[in-house]
Amino acid sequence: MSFVVIIPARYASTRLPGKPLVDINGKPMIVHVLERARESGAERIIVATDHEDVARAVEVAGGEVCMTRADHQSGTERLAEVVEKCAFSDDTVIVNVQGDEPMIPATIIRQVADNLAQRQVGMATLAVPIHNAEEAFNPNAVKVVLDAEGYALYFSRATIPWDRDRFAKDLETVGDNFLRHLGIYGYRAGFIRRYVTWQPSPLEHIEMLEQLRVLWYGEKIHVAVAQEVPGTGVDTPEDLKRVRAEMR
């Protein structure tokens, strides 16, 4: 099954300026992500960036670049520009791999593509179980609740589902009902084209989660449990220090 990986790599970052180019053990972070995508068996890999320095780093590593505007409000909007510039057919399977995930396993890149291809659904993504209270109550760890067939009911930074009886007694432990969403998405190119025609939803603005736009407009998102748990993503200088140590 063929699929295309697009890696959005926005240069500006309030917490870590020039994030795609930060050095991780001798390579720019974006090159590590490119290498993980290559291991997935993708037919084509494109780094979508708004900065010439990022483009040069990718090209030196033998990667393909698509220059995009700097004013996109989300990674999916950046993907839509690439979809149009590359004239992908509506049924092309696109996997959005975040440019700040240098430790993402190649297996889950392919997993999300396979999950999408096997279903008549606009969008697919992955999640992993949460086993500790710190993560369950962390607003930076996005939680997702599913229906009986694995489709998302809701994504939230809040602790969902709220375990009423357990939490009335104890906020230090959690049960087996919590899933943390992973920021990897599979879509067909035609779905991306439709997504960017929709106005952002109120819930999307409240939670600051772009996938809520999909649920707001009545579309389904399939969520599978990831075959491997990815390593740390890089959002802060502290994350960067940790990733450098883990990737030695």
Swiss-Prot record:
Reaction(s) catalysed (UniProt annotation): 3-deoxy-alpha-D-manno-oct-2-ulosonate + CTP = CMP-3-deoxy-beta-D-manno-octulosonate + diphosphate
Coiled coil: none
UniProt enzyme class: transferase
Organism superkingdom: Bacteria
E.C. designation(s): 2.7.7.38
Localization in the cell: Cytoplasm
A biological process from GO: CMP-keto-3-deoxy-D-manno-octulosonic acid biosynthetic process
Keywords: Cytoplasm, Lipopolysaccharide biosynthesis, Nucleotidyltransferase, Transferase
Functional summary from the UniProt entry: Activates KDO (a required 8-carbon sugar) for incorporation into bacterial lipopolysaccharide in Gram-negative bacteria.
Protein name per UniProt: 3-deoxy-manno-octulosonate cytidylyltransferase
Organism expressing this protein natively: Escherichia coli O6:H1 (strain CFT073 / ATCC 700928 / UPEC)
Taxonomic lineage: Bacteria, Pseudomonadati, Pseudomonadota, Gammaproteobacteria, Enterobacterales
